[in-house]
Amino acid sequence: MKLIFAEQAWEDYLHWQQTDKHITRRIHELIKDTTRNPFSGIGKPEPLRFALAGFWSRRINGEHRMVYKVEGNNLLLAQLRYHY
C-alpha cells in the first residue's frame, strides 16, 4: 500500500518527530497496522461521519488521532494530531 501524507499530516508528523519520540513510534505502529488491516486492528479504528465521511480514525493516545482514508492501494493520511 502506498503512503500519502496530506500537508497537515506531514506537518503533524514533523512536529511529533521533534517533540515526542514515543508518539512518533506509536504513529509508525498505527501506519504499519493500517497498511495490513485498514479497517480493523490497533488504535480502535472507527469510520468518521458527516463532513469527514469516508475517512477513518485510530487513537494515537487519549488526546490525538490519526485520520486517514483508503483509496484503492493508497493510504492517505489527513491528520496526525488533535481530535478531528
Where are these regions (language model features)?
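A short, surface-exposed loop/turn module that caps and links secondary-structure elements
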Residues: 32-59
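Enriched for short, Lys/Arg-rich terminal
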Residues: 2, 8-25, 29, 42, ...
